[in-house]
Amino acid sequence: MTAVQDPTVQRRRLRVELRRARDAAGLRQADVAHAMDWSPSKLIRIERGDVSVSTNDLRALLNHYGVKDKGKVNRLLELARSARGSSFYDQYADLLKQGYKEYLAYEASASVIRQYDPILIPGLLQTEEYARGLFAGFGRADPENADRGWAVRQHRQEVHDREIPPEMRFVLDEAALRRHVGRGSAMRHQLERIKEYAAEPYISIRILPFTRGAHPGMDGNFILLEFADPNLDDLVHLESINSITVRDDTELIAKYLDRFVQLEELALTPEESIDFLDALISDVSLTDQPTNSAEKEAV
């Protein structure tokens, strides 16, 4: 399976190319907007990747920048066309937090994914039973929303089926592994799935046990996305109760990358983590777990 480029990512690629072309021409945004008879905000939105640009506007813009190479012009025109398409995640916009649709598009294009989570099993590692247990706990107990939520998870997890999957590095807090989510043997199946993923050459899973005490990740989860494409800046994903923030701030990314390295060093080694998982799997009860209290309220 090959990666499908989301329009959100294509807009981001195009914006980098256009900013480079303007810089190479030695032009300011205000001068370009005036010459094109555009409002300054239109060019700003295009260069930020907030909006698509028509092929006619793009041709005029490239001509103004002195870009004459036909191969480059055609490549950028094709990029603009693909940037105007629809995203798989558009149909789930009502289900996703603000900013999450954009994050998912970037995640699918990343070459390296680093994630720390103190509470939940990351979506890229979740089983269907675990995911549906989460939806119930979040108050999404109705079948339609649960089905749609799982469809989003499934689409994300298609990265595992690529010929060359991204490198994935996870640090999981013991709390996320011990919290029973779902019913019956759901949690045992989830732990077994994590163990299976840990055996994959492109995945590193380290467990941060309670015995490590206080640590740098206690103030929340985060995800770092690294891209092989020079036209895509690396990103950090931060989450609050109502929204998702995706930042390309170099200093902020360096701060969180340093934090992730600290957490990896503090966590168990991959081999020790497998032994830890084996012990947890043995401890998990095979009897039905009680229904989540949040699920009771939502039904």
Where would I find each of the regions flagged by the language model?
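Short helix-to-coil "ATP-lid" hinge immediately C-terminal to the conserved N-box Asn in the Bergerat
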Residues: 23
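Tryptophan-centered motif/residue detector
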Residues: 38, 88-89, 222
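C-terminal regulatory/effector modules of DNA-binding transcriptional regulators
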Residues: 164, 181-299
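Interdomain hinge/linker segments and adjacent boundary elements that couple functional modules
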Residues: 2-16, 20, 30-34, 48, ...
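Short acidic (Asp/Glu) and glycine-rich catalytic loops that position anionic groups and cofactors
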Residues: 37, 55-59, 234-239
